[in-house]
Amino acid sequence: MRSLVISKDEINQVVKKYDKNKITICTIGSHSALHVFRGAYDEGFRRCAICAKGREVPYQRYKSAEEFIMVDKFSDVNDEKIQQQLRDMNAVIVPHGSFVAYVGLDRIENDFLVPMIGNRNILRWEAERDRVTKLFEAANIRKPMKINGPDKIDRACMVKFPGARGGRGYFVTDSPAGFDEKMKLMINKGWLTEEDRAKAHIEEYVAGDIYCMHYFYSPLTKTVELLGMDRRHEANIDGLVRIPAKDQIEAGLQPTYVVTGNFPIVARESLLDQAFGMGDRLAEVAEKMVPPGLLGAFCIQTMCTDNLEFVAFEISARQDGGTNTFMNGSPYSYLLYGDGMSMGRRYSREVKNALAADRLEDILT
């Protein structure tokens, strides 16, 4: 009888049975899958898209895969029949935000016995902000001050909630009464529940520009690559700021922070030392605290203040949605690889390099 938590040895046993000449790159058709599939094609791999019925159109229209697995809902990927189908095609899963949200952390850790690129055991850390804080503190990365409960709010604060929500339900407030008022508003919208109240993560609001930094850590070369940066389009806050302040007050509109899209950004060159330092230190401490660490893509979401200092507020311990901004490469990936290196393609390049070195097990969990 197997243990509750999927072990590295179990994954290695699956990988040993794979036909290494017929590896298939696979992920859920959502979030940031398009460049995963295109990157796999560019690196010469077969592709499989797992699509929820009714959500397959983009992946069919862009000819994203040779094979499609259609499911009623994404969580059906946990069914043993589908898992066996994936293993039979020598599938390697690329995890992203929708994969984590829909498949579920418990199932990924305990039931989903298909090899994935990256560390399945660190995915829970990105969802639990106290664990993120531990990583930031160990890596000496500045973070916003945490406020210990709604009754302690005495300044402008950002209120967030765990999980890959795309900013849905986040809000800014400066008082306990404001917290209660906005919680009620979000509950009425159906974005939060009463149970979420106890899960609220409250931190000081840091004014600055958003920089989401996209890294790739290769366990084969022990190097961290900075491949791109982005910032987010958020509704309705980005629309509200176009309204004159007087009209905003009169309209009485409440800002929300739902991510609707992303656009690329380039930092001033003098800031890159900080960017590399944060990525290097985070990868180093993650390997010690949550072995084998941050394998593959990860993202540090930051604000850059007017003192030209990055303050980190979240991480993604897998491919982040902002990687969609460089499907054909970014200015930073161009410096390393020339044209056409998306994060999705970088995953497939890592698989190709691991196969050539007979080290596929080293990049999978």
UniProtKB/Swiss-Prot annotation:
It holds the Pfam family DUF1246. Its cofactor is Mg(2+); Mn(2+). NCBIfam families: PRK13278.1-5 (NF009780). It comes from Methanocella arvoryzae (strain DSM 22066 / NBRC 105507 / MRE50). Its EC number is 6.3.4.23. Belongs to the phosphohexose mutase family. Keywords: ATP-binding, Ligase, Magnesium, Manganese, Metal-binding, Nucleotide-binding, Purine biosynthesis. Residues 120-352 form the ATP-grasp domain. Catalyzes the ATP- and formate-dependent formylation of 5-aminoimidazole-4-carboxamide-1-beta-d-ribofuranosyl 5'-monophosphate (AICAR) to 5-formaminoimidazole-4-carboxamide-1-beta-d-ribofuranosyl 5'-monophosphate (FAICAR) in the absence of folates. One of its GO terms (biological process) is 'de novo' IMP biosynthetic process. It comes from the Archaea. Mg(2+) binds at residues 301, 314. Binds 1 Mg(2+) or Mn(2+) ion per subunit. This is 5-formaminoimidazole-4-carboxamide-1-(beta)-D-ribofuranosyl 5'-monophosphate synthetase. Pathway: Purine metabolism; IMP biosynthesis via de novo pathway; 5-formamido-1-(5-phospho-D-ribosyl)imidazole-4-carboxamide from 5-amino-1-(5-phospho-D-ribosyl)imidazole-4-carboxamide (formate route): step 1/1. 5-amino-1-(5-phospho-beta-D-ribosyl)imidazole-4-carboxamide binds at residues 31, 98, 262. The gene is purP. GO terms for molecular function: ATP binding; ligase activity, forming carbon-nitrogen bonds; magnesium ion binding. Transmembrane segments: none annotated. InterPro entries: ATP_grasp_subdomain_1, IMP_biosynth_PurP, IMP_biosynth_PurP_C, IMP_biosynth_PurP_N, PreATP-grasp_dom_sf. HAMAP family: IMP_biosynth_PurP. It catalyses: 5-amino-1-(5-phospho-beta-D-ribosyl)imidazole-4-carboxamide + formate + ATP = 5-formamido-1-(5-phospho-D-ribosyl)imidazole-4-carboxamide + ADP + phosphate. ATP binds at residues 150-212, 234.
